Curated annotation (Swiss-Prot):
Keyword hit for Iron: no
Positions with biased composition (Low complexity): 50-83
ATP-binding recorded as keyword: yes
The protein, known as: Probable serine/threonine-protein kinase DDB_G0277449
Catalyzed chemical reaction(s): L-seryl-[protein] + ATP = O-phospho-L-seryl-[protein] + ADP + H(+); L-threonyl-[protein] + ATP = O-phospho-L-threonyl-[protein] + ADP + H(+)
SMART domains for the chain: S_TK_X (SM00133), S_TKc (SM00220)
Record organism: Dictyostelium discoideum
Gene3D superfamilies: Phosphorylase Kinase, domain 1, Transferase(Phosphotransferase) domain 1
EC class: transferase
Binding-site list for ATP: 134-142, 157
Molecular functions (GO terms): ATP binding; protein serine kinase activity; protein serine/threonine kinase activity
Amino acid sequence: MTTTISSNLPSQLEISPTKLLITKQPIKLRESTESPFKSMMDTFKNTIISTSPTECEESSSSTITTPSEESLSSGEESSSISDSESKIITIATLLKPSNSVQDFTPLCNGAQETEIVKISNSINLSNFIIKHLVGKGGFGKVFQVVHVDTQKVYALKVIKKNHIIAKKSVVNTLAEKDILKKISHPFIVNLHYAFQNEKKLYLVMDFVNGGQLFYHLQKEAIFSEDQVRFYMAELILALEHLHDSNIVHRDLKPENILLDSQGHCILTDFGLAKLEVKTNNETFSFAGTLEYMAPEMIQHATCGKAVDWWSIGILMYDMMIGKPPFEHKNRALMQEKIISEKAKFPKFVSSSARSLINGLLTKDPTKRLGANGAIEIKRHPFFKSIQWRKIENKEITPPFVPSTKGIDDISNFDHASLKAHQRDSFSTSPTLSSSQQAYFDGFSFVRTPVLLESQK
C-alpha cells in the first residue's frame, strides 16, 4: 500500500527558528581508530558552545539513572534515587514567542568572525519528557520518552552530529530517517518525528517494550523450532517489504530485533541500510556485524539484497543452536571461516531446518535461497505450516509473550549494561561550520495523523 506523507505541520506546534552563531574558525575532525560500533569519537578541544539557560534541568528516574539533555552534552551523571524519591526528567521549555530567537554563542578568546545559521523545528525536545535510558550504541543513546501533550510513550534516538561527520556516516544517518519516513509495515518500527538542534539529531520512534530478541535469547539460550519458525516468518515478511522497496537492511542481528508486548517481531536500527538497491551488482562498504556479514561483503565483491538472506540464515542458526555458526576470536580467521567453511549442526536440528539454513548460507549470492525473491524462502518445506496472510495480519498468536506491566514498562531491557553507560562519552561538543550544518537541512519530519491512522 502506497502512503503519502504530508509535509504540512500542525500549526499548534509551530515555533520560531533557533538562531545559532557558528564560528568560521577551521575545525579539524579527527578520525577515530576504534570501531564505530564500540566507541564514540575523541573529545573536541578547540571550541565550547555555551548552553542557553533554558537547557534541561538535571534530574533522575526511579529505575534507571538517566541523564537530562544537559548531561547528554556535558557528560554529567545523574544520581540514583529510591522509588519513593523518584523524579521524572522534565525538559525546560524552549518555546519562544514568534518574535524572539535563542542565541548560542561560542566562548572564544578575542574577536572572531561568525555567521548566523537557522535551524527551524516544528517540534523539539521540550515536547517530550525523558524517563529512562533504554539503549546504547556507537551512534549514541535511546531513551524512553513521553509526549507532553498526548502522553504517548515513544523511543527517542539521539545521534551526535560531530560523531557521524567524523565517522563519515552522515549519508547513512540521513538514509535511516528517509527509510523510516517512507516505510510502513507491521513488523518494522515506525518513525513519528525527526528534529535537530545545533549539536544533535533526534528520531522519535515506537517504544517497543518487549525487549531485544538478543535479551530473550540470552535468557533462554535457544528457542524451540516452532518459536524460530514464527520469528523467521515475521522477519521474512519485513525483509520482503524492504526489498520490494529496493532497501537492504545490512545489519540484521538479534540486537536489532525487538519484541512487542504481544510477542511480535519489530525490525529496527536502519543506520546501515541502503536505499535504491535494484541489482545484485552494487558495491557495499565493509559495514555491519562480522558474525552476520555475508561472504561477498567481506570479499568486497558486488552485492545485492541477498546479503540480508545470508544474515537471516545466521540468525536462524543462532536462535536454534545458541551461537552463530562461524566464530573465532581472531577477526581475520573468522572472515576465513565465513568465506570457506560450512555450518555444522547438532543432531537435534531437523532436516527441514538444516535445509533452510544451508540454502540461506549458500556462499554464492546468485545461488542463495532468496536470490530470486522471498517467495523462494516462503515455499521452503520448513514453512509448510505457515499461513503467510494470517502471519502478516497478526492473526497467529505468538509462541512467547514477554512479561510487561504496561506500555511504559522497561523490565525487559538490560538495566546493568545500560547503567554502565550513563555518562556521555565527552563533555563538550565542537562548533560545526555552516557547511557542516547544511548536511542536515530538511531533516525535520512530523508524521501526520492521517498517515498514523493508515498504519493501524
